[in-house]
């Protein structure tokens, strides 16, 4: 794993280089897309980006949890959570990248 985090600025820079919009327009485009996705999720809508992933809001019922330090039972309030489910296309790309990286990192003369 590279450990790199891709930021909004990185996405805007990529749009700038690949699409040809100005840097300002690229940043505005990225912000608009992110805002639209966030607004849809907040409204409880499912956001499906083909070949990428599905974002969905789920309701979780109240349940009993346990304090790990004391073992005491504690009620956990009902809440809404967002889930992210990667598409099969994305999962395949990740797997291929992982396999390619493993092959590339494999030592040429393994020790017995």
From Swiss-Prot:
NCBIfam families: himA, PRK00285.1. Keywords: DNA recombination, DNA-binding, Transcription, Transcription regulation, Translation regulation. InterPro entries: Hist_DNA-bd, Histone-like_DNA-bd_CS, IHF-like_DNA-bd_dom_sf, IHF_alpha. Heterodimer of an alpha and a beta chain. CDD domains: IHF_A. One of its GO terms (biological process) is DNA recombination. GO terms for cellular component: cytosol. SMART domains: BHL. This protein is one of the two subunits of integration host factor, a specific DNA-binding protein that functions in genetic recombination as well as in transcriptional and translational control. Belongs to the bacterial histone-like protein family. One of its GO terms (molecular function) is DNA binding. This is Integration host factor subunit alpha. It comes from the Bacteria. PROSITE patterns: HISTONE_LIKE (PS00045). It holds the Pfam family Bac_DNA_binding.
């Amino acid at each position: 794993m590279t450990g790199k985090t891709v930021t909004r600025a990185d996405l805007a820079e990529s749009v700038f280089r690949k699409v040809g919009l100005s840097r300002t327009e690229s940043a505005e485009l990225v912000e608009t897309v992110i805002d639209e996705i966030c607004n849809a999720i907040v409204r409880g809508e499912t956001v499906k980006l083909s070949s990428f992933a599905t974002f969905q809001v789920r309701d979780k019922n109240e349940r009993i949890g346990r304090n790990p330090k004391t073992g005491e039972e504690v009620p956990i309030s009902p809440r809404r959570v967002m889930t992210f489910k990667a598409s099969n296309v994305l999962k395949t790309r990740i797997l291929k990248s992982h396999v390619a990286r493993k092959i590339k990192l494999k030592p040429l003369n393994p020790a017995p």
